[in-house]
Amino acid sequence: MQEIAQATFNYHDFNEIMPTIFRRFVEKEAHDWRQIYKALQLLEYIVKNGSERVVDEARAHLSTIKILRNFHYIDEQGKDQGVNIRARAKELAALLSDFDTIRAERRKARALSLIHI
């Protein structure tokens, strides 16, 4: 994920990464819930660790993220696999709606990345 976050600072890579993430949200069927969940995880990570443009692009797609707060998928065993997507989408939507929290999370992520270098 760190490599992808770093790639968002490159204009060409950014323009490949972001549309791919948002395509995962709208083009996948409910039974592909794992790909949707992983795309949400990645988006949250790059919002905190990627370029500032990621934040702007994610905020521009906030309505799509908010729709995922109502995601439902019950698998063959009767387990609600949508619960984690709903929770992650709710957290991400809240994060993107609050500039101060975004700044604080990005600062925290930057500090952690310096420790791991």
Residue ranges of each PLM-predicted region?
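Conserved small/polar residues in nucleotide/adenosyl-binding loops
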Residues: I115-I117
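Alpha-helical solenoid scaffolds in eukaryotic proteins
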Residues: E16-R23, T64-Y73
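Short inter-helical turns and helix N-cap capping residues of alpha-solenoid HEAT/ARM repeat scaffolds
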Residues: E29-D32, S51, G82
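Extended alpha-helical interaction segments
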Residues: M1-Q35, I102, R107, L112
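Short conserved catalytic/interaction loops centered on acidic-Pro-aromatic/His motifs
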Residues: N49-A58, A104
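Hydrophobic residues within the alpha-helices of tandem HEAT/HEAT-like
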Residues: R24-F25, Q41-K48, L92-S97
